[in-house]
A protein has these predicted regions:
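Bacterial N-terminal signal peptides that target proteins for export
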Residues: 1-11
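N-terminal ligand-binding lobe of clamshell/alpha-beta domains
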Residues: 24-235
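C-terminal motif of bacterial Sec signal peptides marking the signal peptidase cleavage site
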Residues: 18-22
Length: 235
């Protein structure tokens, strides 16, 4: 039973690492908001990234104007820069206040400019317009896999492609064990914070490996249920 208890504890740690790091900077941040050394050297160089959908997106220079289509993307950007999680962000999704009200209140206290970031609506609900996105002159829109699927269905992706709006896809929900590190690596390149992304991914991978090793040694493996998003009816 002790082995099983350790296994469950490890799973919880692995599942929550990204959110804990987002709130406090975790062990991956040195408290400085500067760009990575490698990023500074190539700040004006061309950049090509691959998102979780396997799409390659190229930029003539380092993106400077970024839209977080999901406001909760700040959980991840806080890992890259806990002092300035909205650095380079010109607009964000409207979900942050409603989906994570307690987090939003604390974030607003720690980062006062949070309240000044314009909201674009919710891409998953289809209430975002191309005209609104264009008004912020973005270099790239960061959307989730949920947004990507919804926008593909309702024709928003076609409209964005026609308007020349570049976008990349992240995923921390649908396949977290596969796509968490891919998403952080992607954001590290987009936000020019590759060193912070690499540090977090190492910590994440080490934690997941420990969980797997503990689980493999467990004598009893009863079925468990982890309520990932307490309070949400569709969970």
């Amino acid at each position: 039973m002790k082995s099983y208890t350790k296994m469950v504890a490890g799973v919880v740690v692995a599942a929550c690492t990204i959110f804990v790091s987002a709130c406090g900077g975790g062990t991956t941040s040195n408290g400085e908001g500067g760009s990575s050394a490698s990023g500074n050297a190539a700040n004006n160089a061309a950049l090509t990234v691959t998102d979780v959908q396997g799409r390659e997106v190229s930029f003539d220079k380092q993106p400077e104007r970024i839209i977080l289509a999901e406001g909760r993307g700040v959980f991840a950007t806080s890992i890259l820069d806990k002092d300035k999680p909205f650095d380079k962000v010109v607009a964000r999704g409207s979900d942050l206040k409603t989906a994570a009200p307690s987090f939003y209140e604390e974030l607003e206290k720690a980062v006062p400019e949070t309240k000044d970031i314009p909201e674009i609506g919710n891409m998953a609900k289809g209430d975002v317009t191309v005209e609104n996105l264009l008004s912020y002159n973005p270099d790239v829109v960061v959307m989730t896999a949920d947004h990507y699927k919804a926008s593909e269905t309702n024709g928003m992706l076609t409209k964005m492609d026609d308007a020349g709006i570049k976008y990349v896809v992240t995923d921390f929900r649908q396949h977290p064990l596969t796509n968490t590190t891919k998403s952080i690596e992607l954001l590290g390149k987009i936000f020019d914070k590759e060193d912070k992304a690499e540090a977090f991914n190492k910590d994440w991978t080490d934690t997941v490996d420990r969980v797997k090793e503990t689980a493999a040694k467990a004598d009893k493996k009863p079925k468990t249920f982890l309520w990932r998003a307490a309070g949400w009816n569709d969970c």
